[in-house]
Amino acid sequence: MSKVYIVAAKRTGIGTFLGSLTNVSAAELGAAVVKQIVTDVNLKPEHIDEVISGNVLPAGQGQGVGRQVVIKAGFPNSVVGYGVSMVCGSGMKAIMDGYLKIQAGWSNIIIAGGTESMSQAPYLIPYKTRIGAKMANFEVVDHMIYDALIDAYDGIHMGITAENIVSKHQISREEQDAFAIASQQKAIQAVDSGRFNDEVVPLEVKVGKEVILFDKDEYPNRKTSLEKLATLKPAFKKDGSVTAGNASGINDGAAYVMLVSEAALKQYNLTPLVEIVGVDQAAIDPKVMGLGPVTAIKNVLNRTHTDIKSLDLLELNEAFAAQSLGVIKELSEDLNVDKQWFLERTNVNGGAIALGHPVGASGARIVVTLIHEMKKRHSQQGLASLCIGGGMGTAIILKNV
């Protein structure tokens, strides 16, 4: 089987809900990143076998968001483009699928990642309107809440799954808020110091009557503090501890990588950034979906015969502070590694609590950020993982080249 390398990794800045990227569709966000990736590696688009796009909220976006990304990027009609939906894991699952296709010899060059415009998620009326009703009200459904943030089996919000982890592991409100403020501080430092500049594709976007250059993450909260976080009311449960301040955001953005085989690497004289060591996934009880990374990470460590302590950096998507702390607690116990070891190496430039969580893109976003940080620090190995609504997790291990 072929080794698989990543030769380019890019993303947009992450927009706030109804913020600067509101008027940019998911396909347009994805196309901008994909187009820049091909330019960066100086490769003709016709050499791309396919583009795989994670996307969770396609309603109202038009037929085939994945194919739209290809066409809007200006690629020839011969390049295949399609979508993948695995809720929060969609962007990483796209990368995993691309990796497995190249490893199996099916493809040589694939661009994979994810794109999401949560701001453009429409309101829906139920299918029964097609049948008609003699009387009574029709409910209007929020596509974004219903299809991305509500558990399909128990009808509970993702925030309640975080509260379930709080109960399981007795995680205090103070621990959650401290984790959240640390994420904010690291993210603000990274944005202000230009730490993300190499990975972000600048976009010209229209905001009101102005055209601005959108080239930085706009979600980090510069006005928050531990004191302010402590005043926030529980968001999902009357006596709970999960708040808007210690949970991830609702956001817009896109992130992609270019995957190539050994043969393509040599044929087109491409420079590798990292090699993919391995990938894996897991499924657990949907009611504690946030713990999905625990099993996924243990699976990929076992599959690749990797010692957890050989990892220099980790990107664990911060759906909720409680969820992140629950994952770290279980991993530290199961793998006999000190909790502080994880905290020192995880999300060194902040995570989704501060940067945001555009659901279809986040799995790819953490891979892109991990790659660039590994190159800056000359880290040998890194891991990215995230939880997935419905009770799943995905994980990927990368090796610096």
Regions found by a protein language model. Give the residues of each.
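Condensing-enzyme catalytic core mediating Claisen C-C bond formation in acyl metabolism
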Residues: 1-24, 226-291, 295, 368-369, ...
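N-terminal extracellular/periplasmic Venus flytrap/periplasmic-binding protein-like
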Residues: 10-12, 23-32, 40, 175-267, ...
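Conserved beta-ketoacyl condensing-enzyme motif
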Residues: 22-89, 93-110, 114-133, 200-216, ...
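Short, well-ordered amphipathic alpha-helical segments that serve as non-catalytic structural scaffolds
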Residues: 27-41, 65-69, 94-97, 158-165, ...
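Conserved catalytic cysteine-centered active-site region
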Residues: 55-109, 153-157, 223-249, 334-365, ...
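Active-site-proximal alpha-helical scaffold in enzymes
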Residues: 86-116, 166-195, 256-263, 328, ...
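Flexible glycine-/small-residue-enriched beta->alpha junction loops
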Residues: 109-164
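Active-site pocket-lining segment
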Residues: 161-163, 199, 207, 277-280, ...
